[in-house]
């Protein structure tokens, strides 16, 4: 039995000596690599915070102290040592433990996270509640250097420093978010890595002055110019100028050094930020060499590092290829990402058209208004973003793009169910919140071969357009892409009788699988591809009414405000008397799990579609 096998809860760690912690660090890394290679998950970021997490357990008592992990994907070690080690067999699986902190999972998880840059705000709220209730415990925010580039984190720092609330902020600096960090704040942190020269000089000066009478007499005068000296040696005092005491940088793989600083930080009655330097992917050579590749992985082969899933084309790749081709034809096309060039398929564009590629860091709000400014001055911006992250910029989409009717294209990746990352990452709301905004058009490819023709139409529309597509690739490869895009016109994929299935996006593929199943039973429903969710095809709906069809709408989105709502609203206007059913998600959050399992659970699989269609034939 190894050491890790004997440890389950924080109190178990109190018995360990210095050598034990070194052994434990190695065992945890092995456990992580073995476990994540089977289940998939966030690997590189967790490998980088092993010693940091152990130091937190040494310095704090999480039966009373409270910690908020920014994003939360780096909380695996914390979970392992708070009673959830066995749960890693079902990490990110349906009914298994989450890959992010969850209050309903453990008493040690104090705040749910999943999106970036929220931890300082949340921790500050917890700390201020503590103070108002006159309670005594420490509140810690752990935030990465990538997340610190997010505007919300800077807003929170501004508030922290103004009121001087006692709060410990740990900056986990691995020079990465998902991809390499960008921007002015990232450059600033690079400069801070040489700041120990200032700290050593300050210590030497104080020691010299304290050892002489003259020094003691002039110490007060020296302190008046201390800040000026500090500014000369450290390029910027960003944190301290905001009212937050800065300590660091500190080796993020030295448990003793971090523990000592954390213990001292507990005695500081004002906000403090502790700058920790870590290596993303530490302990697994392949992840050290390619931390972005191993940031989030599916199940993989330990020796080769290659994914166990068979490689196939994806919507992200199809989008990236299409944008490169269009960019070669039109120099006005520019691409924008919020720190995710690889995940959104923009890597190739960034290499081929460096001057027309803009990575703004974790800053979706800024990205959208940047795109609006570009569009107002004659460019054709395409902002590639995951569905779950676009919702962070809702106001900018409405206020800065759509009110002015500016030609910005939103390439919405990971739309619909994404699976294992759970509630915080499912992309099931975009059709609803975008449909309510005037001026915007929403198009959805039924297969990845349609991405290029719809993207070309979107870029040339001269109005706001959202093109929405899911994670992964095709389910079936028998569908022919549309050749021409006509605004607001839907495609009849299969002509049948009595029942009409109106589906959008990947759900068209589900509908066609169901159609084949039904055909064997002597039923032949019409299947319509709702290429446009906004505007809808009113003429076709009027024809469906005249022909007396019953209708089933299907979407990988919440039903309220989506395709089903739009169809029902219009049919009500034209006094439709038939039966209409809608499939999608009800008023709830969708948990983690395999995509196919989730589709089946929420009745979006072909078997359930077939059952509903058969009832509509009765």
Curated annotation (Swiss-Prot):
The broad enzyme category this protein falls into is: transferase
Q: Where does Mg(2+) bind?
A: 145, 174
In terms of CDD domains, this protein maps to: TPP_DXS, TPP_PYR_DXS_TK_like
The cofactor note from the UniProt entry for this protein is:
Binds 1 Mg(2+) ion per subunit.
Superkingdom of the source species: Bacteria
Q: Does the keyword Calcium apply?
A: no
Which cofactor(s) does the record list? Mg(2+); thiamine diphosphate
Q: Which GO terms describe its cellular component?
A: cytosol
Protein name, as recorded: 1-deoxy-D-xylulose-5-phosphate synthase
> Where does this protein come from, organism-wise?
Clostridium beijerinckii (strain ATCC 51743 / NCIMB 8052) (Clostridium acetobutylicum)
